[in-house]
């Protein structure tokens, strides 16, 4: 997972490390997935040596709900657009964790130290799997987590922005019902992105929420679902936020899996996703290689990593443009 500071050339990458497998019983608090922070000060041209943060992050929860295994969901770590405490705008990362599901951690020093959003006892998505975070226009934090046939959502509201205190709503499952395409029953992680937009029919300023997922019965047909956030009532609580999607755009017509996206400087959506699953031994230099056994447990190497630059008008069939 990666983020670049909005006011400098500093880049932070958070990576799972070591030789443990998240789902194995042998991976536990005494033999955990390791977590490494890797930093660049020149926009990614050069990188410093990795710094292990395993104990600093796992230790946040030792006195409340101890974690046996965890990692930061791959893709985008998001940096707040509105919350700045000290030198940096706040960054947030969603942990895939067991037992008791997702946790959200945040940092005000760009990943040198971390705290638990909502406190160490908070369990925002107890049934969650791989997850991502985003920010509403008013600074509240959304977590969106992988589940079969949809996404889990929850919403964090601050009581005190500076100290990070506040409260989570209840985890809520959304199935994007009413669409011709439905989220996959064999899911992967996707990405949420909320962009400032203009409704093209009348010029009204709104926000548009995007959520990418694979669709159908397998890991296929990665698509981006979209929903208008016209005013505060559309995001008054987690249920209002999760319900009532307006449409979707199918990015891939074939086998496709994990995805991530962010807003580019040119107001287009940078969309990254996995496509074209490569079976073990069929390609001499696969882009992604299974870990840690080489051939992996499912007899495949991995996928091609694909980048597309998409206009919001394309994703929403001309209904919105970025402002």
Each predicted region: which residue ranges?
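Short, surface-exposed charged micro-motifs
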Residues: 1, 132, 260
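Beta-rich carbohydrate-recognition and catalytic domains
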Residues: 4-73, 78-188, 194-254, 268, ...
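Hydrophobic, well-ordered secondary-structure elements that form the walls
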Residues: 192, 261
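Extracellular glycan/ECM-engagement signal in secreted proteins
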Residues: 263, 267-269
């Amino acid at each position: 997972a990666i983020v670049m500071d909005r006011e400098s050339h500093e880049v932070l990458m958070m990576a799972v490390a070591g030789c443990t497998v998240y789902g194995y019983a042998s991976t536990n608090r005494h033999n955990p997935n390791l977590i490494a922070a890797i930093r660049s000060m020149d926009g990614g041209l050069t990188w410093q040596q990795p710094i292990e943060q395993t104990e600093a992050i796992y230790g946040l929860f030792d006195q409340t709900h101890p974690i046996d295994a965890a990692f930061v969901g791959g893709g985008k770590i998001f940096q707040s657009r509105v919350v700045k405490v000290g030198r940096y705008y706040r960054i947030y990362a969603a942990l895939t964790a067991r037992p008791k599901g997702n946790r959200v951690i945040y940092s005000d020093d760009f990943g040198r130290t971390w705290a638990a959003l909502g406190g160490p006892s908070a369990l925002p998505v107890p049934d969650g799997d791989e997850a991502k975070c985003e920010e509403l226009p008013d600074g509240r934090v959304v977590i969106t987590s992988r589940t079969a046939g949809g996404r889990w959502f929850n919403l964090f509201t601050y009581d005190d922005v500076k100290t990070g205190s506040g409260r989570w709503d209840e985890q809520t499952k959304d199935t994007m019902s009413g669409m011709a395409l439905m989220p996959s029953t064999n899911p992967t992680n996707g990405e949420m992105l909320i962009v400032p937009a203009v409704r093209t029919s009348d010029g009204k300023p709104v926000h548009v929420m995007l959520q990418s997922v694979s669709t159908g019965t397998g890991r296929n047909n990665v698509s981006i679902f979209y929903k208008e956030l016209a005013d505060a009532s559309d995001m008054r609580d987690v249920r209002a936020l999760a319900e009532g999607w307006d449409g979707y755009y199918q990015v891939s017509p074939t086998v496709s899996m994990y995805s991530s996206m962010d807003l580019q400087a040119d107001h287009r959506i940078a969309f990254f996703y996995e496509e074209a699953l490569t079976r073990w031994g069929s390609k001499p230099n696969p882009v992604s290689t299974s870990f840690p056994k080489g051939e992996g447990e499912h007899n495949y190497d991995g996928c091609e990593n694909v980048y597309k630059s998409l206009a919001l008008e394309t994703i929403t069939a001309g209904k919105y443009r970025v402002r």
